[in-house]
Protein backbone atom coordinates (compact mmCIF):
# COMPACT_ATOMS: atom_id res chain seq x y z
CA UNK A 1 0.00 0.00 0.00
CA UNK A 2 1.54 3.27 -1.15
CA UNK A 3 0.94 6.08 1.32
CA UNK A 4 1.61 9.79 0.93
CA UNK A 5 1.15 9.94 -2.84
CA UNK A 6 0.36 13.65 -2.89
CA UNK A 7 -3.34 14.03 -3.67
CA UNK A 8 -6.77 13.04 -2.40
CA UNK A 9 -9.01 10.68 -4.36
CA UNK A 10 -12.21 12.52 -3.34
CA UNK A 11 -14.19 9.28 -3.71
CA UNK A 12 -14.10 9.48 -7.50
CA UNK A 13 -12.47 7.80 -10.46
CA UNK A 14 -9.47 9.56 -11.97
CA UNK A 15 -11.49 10.94 -14.90
CA UNK A 16 -14.26 12.18 -12.61
CA UNK A 17 -11.70 13.78 -10.28
CA UNK A 18 -9.97 15.49 -13.21
CA UNK A 19 -13.30 16.85 -14.50
CA UNK A 20 -14.27 18.04 -11.02
CA UNK A 21 -11.05 19.99 -10.52
CA UNK A 22 -11.28 21.46 -14.03
CA UNK A 23 -14.85 22.66 -13.45
CA UNK A 24 -14.03 24.08 -10.01
CA UNK A 25 -10.99 25.88 -11.46
CA UNK A 26 -13.08 27.40 -14.27
CA UNK A 27 -15.69 28.56 -11.74
CA UNK A 28 -12.99 30.10 -9.54
CA UNK A 29 -11.40 31.95 -12.45
CA UNK A 30 -14.75 33.30 -13.64
CA UNK A 31 -16.16 34.25 -10.21
CA UNK A 32 -12.98 34.93 -8.17
CA UNK A 33 -14.62 33.19 -5.16
CA UNK A 34 -16.56 29.93 -4.76
CA UNK A 35 -17.93 27.86 -1.89
CA UNK A 36 -17.15 24.15 -1.77
CA UNK A 37 -16.15 21.53 0.78
CA UNK A 38 -12.89 22.09 2.63
CA UNK A 39 -11.23 19.00 1.13
CA UNK A 40 -12.17 19.99 -2.43
CA UNK A 41 -10.96 23.54 -1.73
CA UNK A 42 -7.57 22.23 -0.60
CA UNK A 43 -7.19 20.11 -3.74
CA UNK A 44 -8.36 22.99 -5.93
CA UNK A 45 -5.86 25.32 -4.26
CA UNK A 46 -2.97 23.11 -5.31
CA UNK A 47 -4.38 22.74 -8.84
CA UNK A 48 -5.12 26.42 -9.50
CA UNK A 49 -1.88 27.76 -7.99
CA UNK A 50 0.14 25.63 -10.40
CA UNK A 51 -1.94 27.01 -13.29
CA UNK A 52 -1.48 30.62 -12.17
CA UNK A 53 2.27 30.12 -11.85
CA UNK A 54 2.37 28.67 -15.37
CA UNK A 55 0.14 31.46 -16.74
CA UNK A 56 2.32 34.17 -15.21
CA UNK A 57 5.09 33.27 -17.68
CA UNK A 58 2.91 34.98 -20.29
CA UNK A 59 4.30 33.04 -23.23
CA UNK A 60 2.32 31.39 -26.00
CA UNK A 61 3.34 27.97 -24.72
CA UNK A 62 2.16 28.87 -21.22
CA UNK A 63 -1.18 29.92 -22.70
CA UNK A 64 -1.46 26.54 -24.43
CA UNK A 65 -0.48 24.67 -21.27
CA UNK A 66 -3.20 26.43 -19.26
CA UNK A 67 -5.76 25.75 -22.00
CA UNK A 68 -4.78 22.07 -21.97
CA UNK A 69 -5.84 21.92 -18.32
CA UNK A 70 -8.96 24.12 -18.43
CA UNK A 71 -10.33 23.43 -21.94
CA UNK A 72 -12.26 26.72 -21.78
CA UNK A 73 -11.22 29.68 -23.93
CA UNK A 74 -12.86 32.40 -21.83
CA UNK A 75 -11.43 31.12 -18.54
CA UNK A 76 -7.99 30.61 -20.08
CA UNK A 77 -7.89 34.13 -21.52
CA UNK A 78 -9.08 35.65 -18.25
CA UNK A 79 -6.46 33.70 -16.30
CA UNK A 80 -3.55 34.51 -18.62
CA UNK A 81 -4.45 38.12 -19.52
CA UNK A 82 -6.14 39.50 -16.38
CA UNK A 83 -5.41 37.37 -13.32
CA UNK A 84 -1.84 36.10 -13.74
CA UNK A 85 -0.24 39.54 -14.38
CA UNK A 86 -1.58 40.73 -10.99
CA UNK A 87 0.52 38.04 -9.30
CA UNK A 88 3.72 38.54 -11.29
CA UNK A 89 5.59 39.74 -8.18
CA UNK A 90 4.40 36.83 -5.98
CA UNK A 91 6.08 33.46 -5.72
CA UNK A 92 2.88 31.66 -4.70
CA UNK A 93 -0.02 31.94 -2.29
CA UNK A 94 -2.49 33.24 -4.84
CA UNK A 95 -5.55 31.79 -3.10
CA UNK A 96 -7.08 31.83 0.36
CA UNK A 97 -9.34 29.23 2.00
CA UNK A 98 -11.81 30.50 4.62
CA UNK A 99 -13.86 27.91 6.48
CA UNK A 100 -17.50 28.98 6.64
CA UNK A 101 -20.08 26.51 7.94
CA UNK A 102 -21.31 22.94 8.06
CA UNK A 103 -23.67 21.89 5.27
CA UNK A 104 -27.14 21.20 6.62
CA UNK A 105 -27.78 17.91 4.79
CA UNK A 106 -24.65 15.98 5.68
CA UNK A 107 -22.69 18.25 8.05
CA UNK A 108 -19.81 18.49 5.57
CA UNK A 109 -17.48 21.38 6.42
CA UNK A 110 -17.68 24.08 3.73
CA UNK A 111 -15.22 26.80 2.86
CA UNK A 112 -14.78 29.71 0.50
CA UNK A 113 -11.76 29.61 -1.77
CA UNK A 114 -10.90 32.96 -3.27
CA UNK A 115 -8.19 34.61 -5.29
CA UNK A 116 -6.24 37.10 -3.16
Curated annotation (Swiss-Prot):
Record keywords, A-Z: Ribonucleoprotein, Ribosomal protein
InterPro entries linked: Ribosomal_bL17, Ribosomal_bL17_sf
GO molecular function: structural constituent of ribosome
Tagged with keyword Transmembrane helix: no
GO biological process terms, semicolon-separated: translation
GO cellular component, one term: cytosolic large ribosomal subunit
UniProt-listed Pfam families: Ribosomal_L17 (PF01196)
NCBIfam families: L17
Family of this protein: Belongs to the bacterial ribosomal protein bL17 family.
Subunit (UniProt): Part of the 50S ribosomal subunit. Contacts protein L32.
Family annotation (PANTHER family): LARGE RIBOSOMAL SUBUNIT PROTEIN BL17M, RIBOSOMAL PROTEIN L17
Protein name per Swiss-Prot or TrEMBL: Large ribosomal subunit protein bL17
Amino acid sequence: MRHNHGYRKLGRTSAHRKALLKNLAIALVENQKIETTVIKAKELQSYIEKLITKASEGSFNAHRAVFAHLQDKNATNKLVVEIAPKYSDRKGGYTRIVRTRLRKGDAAPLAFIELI
